[in-house]
Amino acid sequence: MINIEDISKSSNQSEEKQLKSTSSKPKYSFAAKSLFKGSNNITPYYLSTSNTFQCVASESIQTWLLSDDGHIFTSSGNFVLDVSSGGYFVELVQLNSNSKTQIWTIDTTNNKIQNQGNGKYLDIDNLNICVAPLNGNATQQWTTFRRAPIPTGNWGYFQSKQMDSNNNYWGLSVLNNSKSYNTSVVMNKVQAKSKGQIWQMTNDGHILSRLDGSLVLDIGPSINGSTTNYYLDTNVYKANDLKQQWGINENNQIFNQYYPNLCIGFVGELGVDSTVNCVLAQPSSASDINFQWITNPTYSLNEIVSEVPEPFPAYTSGDLLASYQYLSNIATSNFTDDIRSLYTGINVSLQSFLSIVTNATCPSSIHSTEDFSNVQNQIKTELIYAIDVRLVFENYSGFYSKLFSQGSSNLTNLANLINVDMSSNQMVNANYTDAITSVFYSLISEIPVGGSIIANIGQSAVEWGELISQSNYQGASTYQVELSQLYSHLNTNYENEMANAQSMKDTILQDWGMMSKTYALCFLPTNDPSSLNINGLNFEKISDVASVAYEIAMIQMLLPTTYQIYFTPAGYWVPYSDGDFAYSDNSGTYIMATIEYSNSYPPKELTDKLWNNGVSKQEFFWSAYGWNLATSLTYYNMANKFGNIYKLAFPTIKNFTGVPMQFVMTNDGDNLCNFPVKTHFAKFFSIYYSCGDLGHHYFDIAVNDINDNKVANFTVDINLEAIEGSYVSIKTGSLVVQPGYAVGNPICNQGSYSLMFSASILIPIYKSE
């Protein structure tokens, strides 16, 4: 039996330690999978924060933090696992360091999780989590990993394991890249710049399309009236609809939560039939390749470092130990008799070590030539593996260093172009992790073959950084920073991410199982989503795509300090309806101009950096995905009631999460309007209302998610001054944010009396693990 702390060690040896009585501190991230397979003998179940075993492959609700004194925390660190007052079911409660029922012991040898308060074992009762006396059933058996196996919240492809006759991968695709609901989902060859092939699995198991913030994978019509065969299509994101929720089992099948025995597959021959429809049906077997899927990127390194550590073959005595020490000494010129300790060394040549070990002969002091040969062959193999693993990370570090160097040199130029004072104390939202993730998205979107290799390494390093940040390691910081500190902020985060990659590499190089599995990935075909084979990659193209994506991310940070969007509803006059700084749709016209002057537009050099590099005008002007510009309601040359628009302020809620939200604004109890907010989109409150006389006016805003769970509450303070545009801010002390969410720096822009536009305020909401 091992103490919880030992799960993080690079050893599979077990030991028993006395639990401490001090207050706990979260240290290590883990996930626990039950060996119970469910009624279909396929579905894996993971310990979940919902108090029910959910088979959704979701990271946050199935990731826990293990403290060194035996507490099991939720991933947010807000609650711990406890036994209910009835002594049977478990529940999530606040930490009580005096309660022994909040202390658990994980026995990795016998796959058990035991409660120290009552001695019972974690169990399953009708898919509810409970504790029971030892019974030998599979429901009491658990395997633990360093984190849940499928990262959620990242964009990528779902590719079939079945390739066509030309060895091309095909993936889930929205027919004709249509944003319309009830559009068929079919198989298409994976190709660049096809948003209809890019998806994101959310924390609750929805599969969200990159085409639109409310478009998800859904069950379509029945095939010939069958109750076990359905087509797939897209639909609007719905609350608590199991037909829209999915999971990935250990057979790489994507199953439906409402029909857990049915999985996604396809009918037809890839590359031959004109249309190959995706279906929801019963696989013929667990190995039916038409029902097996690969995520791209696979985050293969994330999976490897999540596995139970496997130590190197041990040489502890006799000629085996003598052979190991002899080879270590001659290879390192007597620097050390433990050559494995240098696999992570920066200033050592493993290639030189390999040459010496390969040419070594058994000395007379070692009697067993067989033992010497066995050790020699093992160390040769380890060195070969270590050399290739190091090369992969060296290439990634070179790519990442070049990316940051170019981005840093461009930052000053961008600041001048956007007219930003980089010495000011103005706050900006600078989510570095999102910026880097957007680079990986661009790589897989524009270079599906090759770009995924960089994303596999980079995103796994991000995940690794989040994992080890629980052990007081400094991960990437996010959200708010002063402009004067932006460069330092970016540099610190760059160094942290480089350190994350270095730490992950060192962990792999000190573990025989991880090293072996990583080495194997280096020889997969380049188009394999799990591949780390860098031979033949077009690094120039990869660098160009990444550089543009990073520059766009920097623009997203800087632009809201100088510019905002001016929206005029359809039917009213506007100075421009299209062009470099304008966009129109059925709702009205959006114009980008400076915060102070609605008639001062951005230079063409700036807009060229947007539209010439593939930025979607709709996403930009709607503040979707990485864009977060505040929006002012504007009526040009109006003398009627709209001429008082400068007295008002209109809020925009930006949803950076994978769950739809809604917000309502009220004034003295009167509901002004409810607005839905799509995932990764912003929603602008565009209803005209009456504000009143000079002075402060307060409007309450409540934000809930689609399941009506509270997200945030705050009060908007609108201050009217004589012959001035209104001032807007969040009332001090009014902001309340629920656990699991974070609110970034609100963007507050004053209205204008002379130019007749309203004040604007954008409130960004992020998911916080």
From Swiss-Prot:
Keywords: Cytoplasm, Lectin, Membrane, Repeat. One of its GO terms (biological process) is sorocarp development. It holds the Pfam family Ricin_B_lectin. PROSITE patterns: RICIN_B_LECTIN (PS50231). It is found in: Cytoplasm; Membrane. InterPro entries: Ca_Up-reg_Membrane_Reg, Ricin_B-like_lectins, Ricin_B_lectin. It comes from the Eukaryota. Residues 1-22 are annotated as: Disordered. It is a peripheral membrane protein. The keyword Nucleus does not apply. Residues 25-145, 158-296 form the Ricin B-type lectin domain. GO terms for molecular function: carbohydrate binding. Signal peptide: none annotated. Its main location: cytoplasm. The keyword Cytoplasm applies. Induction: Induced by high levels of extracellular Ca(2+). GO terms for cellular component: cytoplasm; membrane; nucleus. PANTHER family: CALCIUM UP-REGULATED PROTEIN A-RELATED. Belongs to the cup family. May play an important role in stabilizing and/or regulating the cell membrane during Ca(2+) stress or certain stages of development. This is Calcium up-regulated protein B. It comes from Dictyostelium discoideum. The gene is cupB.
